[in-house]
Amino acid sequence: MADLDDIKDGKDFRTDQPQQNIPFTLKGCGALDWGMQSRLSRIFNSKTGKTVMLAFDHGYFQGPTTGLERIDISIAPLFEHADVLMCTRGILRSVVPPATNKPVVLRASGANSILAELSNEAVALSMDDAVRLNSCAVAAQVYIGSEYEHQSIKNIIQLVDAGMKVGMPTMAVTGVGKDMVRDQRYFSLATRIAAEMGAQIIKTYYVDKGFERIVAGCPVPIVIAGGKKLPEREALEMCWQAIDQGASGVDMGRNIFQSDHPVAMMKAVQAVVHHNETADRAYELYLSEKQ
C-alpha cells in the first residue's frame, strides 16, 4: 500500500473552475454508456469523427473470392493503413496477429452462402465471444423487404440487446436482395428501421440521388459500403460524394484489395475521408503512391 508518512493535504482544487467532462459528439451516441462510447471512439477518429474500415469478411458466404484467397499474404499488409478491420472471428483468430492492435468489427451474422437465399441469416456469434476477442463492434445484415426481413430484424434486435449489457455497439448492414432497387427511398427506409431498432452504426450503399436525405433521416452514423469493384477514380469519387453529403466514413473491401495497388488505394481513401481531399487530388495521390 502507499506510504502513510508525510501525507500532504491537497491544495490545487481550482475552485474557480467548474469540473469539465468533454461530451461525446458522435452523431446520436451522446447518451450511450461509457464502455460503448469508448469502443466507438476507437472506430471513429476523434479529430475528424470519421472512419476508414477495411472489410474482408466476404468469405463468410462467398468463400475464397478474388483477393481473399490468402488473407495472410494479400490483406495483412493493409492492416496498418486501415482505421478498423472488419472480419469474421475465424479469420481474426487464425490470421490477424494480436499485435496488429487495430479496432475490430466482427461479422456476427451468417449461416447462408451464395448458393442459397442470401437474406436467410442467423446470429452467428455470441456476445461473450465478441468480448473475449476484444472487438469494438459486431455487425449483421438487415434485409428490409426480403423474404426473411423479419428474421434479419430479429437478429439486429438480439445483438443490440446483448450488446447493451456489455457495452458493445452493433452495426447494421443494409443488405439488398436479388430483386431490390438500390435507391434513396429503399435505403432511407432500411437505415431508419435499423437505427430505430437500436443499431449504433449503419452501413449502407451510396446512391447518386438523395444520399444526403438518407444521412439526414438516420439518427446514427452512416458508413458506406464499397460494393463491387470500380475503377479507382470512380471509387474515390463515390467516397468523396458520400463524405461530402454527410457520411461518417467508408467500409470498403473489393475496391481496396482488388485494386492493382491496394496500399496506394487505401492511402487515397484515407485522404478523402480524413483530409477532405477531392476525388481528383486523391486519385493523383493514388497514382504517385503506386509508383
Curated annotation (Swiss-Prot):
It is an enzyme of class 2 (transferase). Its EC number is 2.3.1.245. It comes from Escherichia coli (strain SMS-3-5 / SECEC). Its main location: cytoplasm. The keyword Transferase applies. Involved in the degradation of phospho-AI-2, thereby terminating induction of the lsr operon and closing the AI-2 signaling cycle. Catalyzes the transfer of an acetyl moiety from 3-hydroxy-5-phosphonooxypentane-2,4-dione to CoA to form glycerone phosphate and acetyl-CoA. Keywords: Cytoplasm, Schiff base, Transferase. This is 3-hydroxy-5-phosphonooxypentane-2,4-dione thiolase. SMART domains: DeoC. NCBIfam families: PRK08227.1. One of its GO terms (cellular component) is cytoplasm. Pfam families: DeoC. The keyword ATP-binding does not apply. Belongs to the DeoC/FbaB aldolase family. Gene3D superfamilies: Aldolase class I. It comes from the Bacteria. It is found in: Cytoplasm. It catalyses: dihydroxyacetone phosphate + acetyl-CoA = 3-hydroxy-2,4-dioxopentyl phosphate + CoA. InterPro entries: Aldolase_TIM, DeoC/FbaB/LacD_aldolase, DeoC/FbaB_aldolase, FbaB-like, LsrF. GO terms for molecular function: acyltransferase activity, transferring groups other than amino-acyl groups; fructose-bisphosphate aldolase activity. The active site is at K203. Homodecamer. The gene is lsrF.
